Amino acid sequence: MDCCTESACSKPDDDILDIPLDDPGANAAAAKIQASFRGHMARKKIKSGECGRKGPGPGGPGGAGGARGGAGGGPSGD
């Protein structure tokens, strides 16, 4: 059974909603959705890159550099 031959798969143009593009609420919602998706893709990319590593990476236990634990300008915690 081919989905493309059925009339249920195709939407008529009447069902498409007309959304005003200058609506501030819609723009804010779109920005949040885009930021969420970009964060998801970044986490997915980082996760796939770390799966192939063995041992601690930079910034991890015994590693050097990174935002934590490196030689930075933050408080020393003494």
Curated annotation (Swiss-Prot):
On this chain, the residues bearing N-acetylmethionine are 1
Please list the tissues where expression of this protein has been recorded: Highly enriched in brain with restricted expression in neuronal subsets primarily in the cortex, striatum, and hippocampus as well as certain nuclei within the thalamus, hypothalamus and olfactory bulb. Accumulates postsynaptically in dendritic spines of neostriatal neurons.
Which portions of the chain have biased composition (kind: Gly residues)? 54-78
Effect annotated for changing residue 4 to G: No effect on oxidant-mediated disulfide bond formation nor on in vitro PKC-mediated phosphorylation. No effect on oxidant-mediated disulfide bond formation
Q: Which domain of life is it from?
A: Eukaryota
PROSITE patterns linked to this entry: IQ
Give the Collagen-like domain ranges: 48-78
Citrulline found at: 68
IQ domain mapped to chain residues: 26-47
Question: For this protein, what post-translational modification is recorded in UniProt?
Answer: Phosphorylated at Ser-36 by PHK and PKC. Phosphorylation prevents interaction with Calmodulin and interrupts several learning- and memory-associated functions.
Q: How the protein is affected by changing residue 51 to G? A: No oxidant-mediated disulfide bond formation. No effect on in vitro PKC-mediated phosphorylation. No oxidant-mediated disulfide bond formation
Q: List the disulfide bonds.
A: 3-51
Region span, Disordered: 39-78
Residue numbers carrying Phosphoserine: 36
* UniProt record, GO biological process: associative learning; positive regulation of long-term synaptic potentiation; postsynaptic modulation of chemical synaptic transmission; telencephalon development
List residues, modification Omega-N-methylarginine.
68
- Which GO molecular function annotation, any one, does this entry have? calmodulin binding
Major site of localization recorded for this protein? cytoplasm
Q: What is known of its domains?
A: Neurogranin is intrinsically unstructured; however, upon binding with CaM, The IQ domain adopts a helical conformation.
**Subunit structure and binding partners:** Interacts with apo-calmodulin; this interaction decreases the affinity of calmodulin for calcium ions.
Write down what this protein is called.
Neurogranin
Q: Which organism is it from?
A: Rattus norvegicus
Q: Which taxonomic lineage does the organism of this UniProt entry have?
A: Eukaryota, Metazoa, Chordata, Craniata, Vertebrata
